[in-house]
Amino acid sequence: MSQPPAKRQKRAEYRKQAAEAVVAQPDESAPVAHVKLPKKKFYRQRAHANPFSDHQLNYPLSPAHMDWASHFPAFVNPDATQTNLIGTRKLLKDVEVVDIGCGFGGLLVGLAGLLPETLMVGMEIRIAVLEYLNTRIQALRVQQQQQQQKTQSHAALVPGGYQNISAIRSNTMKFFPNFFNKHQLSKIFICFPDPHFKARKHKARIISETLNAEYAYALRPGGLLYTITDVEEYHHWILRHFRDESALFERVSEEELEKDECVKVMKEATEEGKKVTRNKGNKYVAVFRRKEDPEWA
């Protein structure tokens, strides 16, 4: 009697089949459930990755070298002469929203229908997690297309049909400016980042004086930077570091946050947010608005 396949081999086979299923063009006569969403249990990975390790990453030399067309095919400029510095087609609009450390993509999926005409990208360093998210996004797109064909309707169940979200593998601490031009972004999300509790690990926190300056460069005046954590000490760390950058950011009032639908999605749609809710933990939210540049800048 043959032995059952090893768990690692089983996971690899599942992931390969899931990726192939969403790449193929959907059959018009196929039911909506023909393409299924991937299962997380087959994309296991450690909770965190060391940002200082020498990961083998692909990143553009500059924002003008970034190939966004492969991520947002529905928004590719139809004019074939409109190409970037590496010869790939430009988009009809720029990416405006970034989810740093996007994980399994709960925030992106939650925001997709809320901001259907806004291009959003998640940045994640873990390979298996990113593979899951991209397979999930492709599956959601195919499901929307199948539903349209089934109902003969031109309106997707979710506005935009998830064509406005994607994810890339990147180390934000090293390569964030390589992807985005000055004042390109309208929103940046940092949801439940690794708190790095030990003092000697604080240099690995995604909120710091140096990184905040990079976020301010990419964020347009009036743009918002959203943060949420379930660690109170880290929340105070965030407040302190943005308070020290008072020339660049100002904190958004609680009254404004209550009216912001993005805050509701950030608190309830992310996988970490759901876990904190199940465990009856606290969620500490702080949102900061990018100030106008001085006239001499």
Swiss-Prot record:
Tell me what reaction this enzyme catalyses: guanosine(46) in tRNA + S-adenosyl-L-methionine = N(7)-methylguanosine(46) in tRNA + S-adenosyl-L-homocysteine
Q: Which PROSITE patterns match?
A: SAM_MT_TRMB
Please give the coiled-coil regions recorded for this protein.
none
Q: Which Pfam families match?
A: Methyltransf_4 (PF02390)
EC number(s) on file: 2.1.1.33
Q: Which keywords does UniProt give here?
A: Methyltransferase, Nucleus, RNA-binding, S-adenosyl-L-methionine, Transferase, tRNA processing, tRNA-binding
Q: Which Gene3D superfamilies match?
A: Vaccinia Virus protein VP39
Q: In which pathway does it act?
A: tRNA modification; N(7)-methylguanine-tRNA biosynthesis
* Location of this chain's protein in the cell: Nucleus
Which protein is depicted? Answer: tRNA (guanine-N(7)-)-methyltransferase
Supply the source organism for this entry: Aspergillus niger (strain ATCC MYA-4892 / CBS 513.88 / FGSC A1513)
Organism lineage reads as: Eukaryota, Fungi, Dikarya, Ascomycota, Pezizomycotina
